[in-house]
């Protein structure tokens, strides 16, 4: 161990140590800045996008269920996998439709105050508990019911989704704005390879769409004005609410959301700012 004979020697050593520490601190700060820039390149680059300058749009928010992912086919697939394991005889198309049909009424209980704020995972489970009885799935274990409930975390994308999102991402910030909770949307993104820049949910505003507070919360978190944000959805009601909140709107036609037997009619052209057949078509219209 080194011994010091004078206070000057100690002071000199302290100054040297402080200098080295300060150099390391500055280096770490610089590395942190570069890491942040690498993690969020669009936050610095999106204003230079030619498409952004041309359209005035800097970010796109996407409805998810039905717009980005094919929920019905995915739930049917999950049900059939379970049926093979448990030797179940269930009409999984009817099951999927019944599960989705409970979605709106369940959210209305939250909107009306009958229920406190309850996220979509819990609302899905409330609906599923009734369906277990209705469809004769009483023999399922708690773990199996929970796994089935999380099928909504494992939904598959429409064929054009990932390619279209990647093109749009090259010119704009792209993010979700769904009634699904953040953990559900994050798991879904990992499962389906969805390249979001951010995951926004009505959960953040504690108000379900079409409440305007859901849209404006996402806009505020992006530090943008409503007119700089484009809401993308396959559901006209979602887009009408977004337009009332001041956002621009893009309708994407998803005729097979409810299956081949119930092809959805296309919304009348001209109501929204953009009307597209797919995400690839929307990217083309936006110059991405």
Where do the protein language model's features map onto the residues?
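Asp-based, Mg2+/Mn2+-dependent phosphohydrolase catalytic module
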Residues: 2-18, 30-35, 51, 181-182, ...
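Active-site neighborhood of HAD-like aspartate-dependent phosphohydrolases
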Residues: 51-101
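Hydrophobic alpha-helical core bundles mediating ligand binding, dimerization, or RNAP-core interactions
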Residues: 75, 79-83, 99-103, 124, ...
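Conserved SAM-binding loop
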Residues: 68, 177, 231-232
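Substrate-recognition element of Asp-dependent hydrolases with the DxDx(T/V) motif
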Residues: 142-191, 199-202
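A metal-dependent, Asp-based hydrolase signature
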Residues: 87, 96-146
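Generic structural signal for small/hydrophobic residues in well-ordered secondary structure
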Residues: 63-66, 128, 176
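N-terminal twin-arginine translocation
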Residues: 19-26, 37-52
């Amino acid at each position: 161990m080194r011994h010091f004979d004078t206070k000057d020697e100690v002071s000199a050593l302290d100054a040297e140590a402080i200098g080295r520490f300060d150099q390391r601190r500055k280096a770490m700060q610089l590395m942190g800045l570069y890491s942040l820039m690498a993690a969020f390149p669009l936050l610095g680059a999106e204003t230079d996008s030619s498409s952004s300058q041309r359209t005035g749009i800097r970010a796109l928010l996407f409805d998810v269920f039905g717009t980005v992912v094919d929920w019905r086919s995915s739930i049917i697939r999950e049900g059939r996998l379970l049926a093979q394991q448990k030797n179940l005889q269930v009409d999984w198309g009817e099951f999927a439709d019944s599960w989705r049909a409970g979605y709106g009424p369940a959210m209305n209980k939250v909107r009306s105050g009958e229920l406190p704020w309850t996220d979509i995972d819990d609302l899905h489970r409330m609906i599923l508990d009734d369906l277990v009885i209705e469809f004769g799935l009483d023999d399922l274990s708690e773990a199996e019911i929970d796994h089935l409930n999380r099928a909504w975390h494992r939904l598959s994308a429409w064929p054009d989704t990932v390619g279209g999102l990647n093109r749009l991402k090259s010119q704009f910030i792209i993010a979700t704005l769904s009634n699904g909770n953040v953990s559900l949307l994050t798991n879904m993104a990992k499962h389906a390879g969805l390249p979001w820049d951010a995951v926004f949910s009505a959960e953040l505003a504690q108000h379900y769409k079409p409440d305007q507070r859901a849209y404006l919360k996402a806009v505020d978190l992006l530090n943008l004005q409503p007119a700089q944000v484009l809401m993308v959805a396959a559901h006209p009601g979602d887009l009408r609410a977004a337009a009332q909140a001041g956002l621009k709107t893009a309708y994407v036609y998803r005729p097979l959301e409810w299956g081949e037997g119930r092809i959805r009619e296309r919304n009348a052209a001209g109501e929204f700012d953009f009307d597209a057949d797919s995400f690839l078509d929307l990217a083309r219209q936006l110059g991405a």
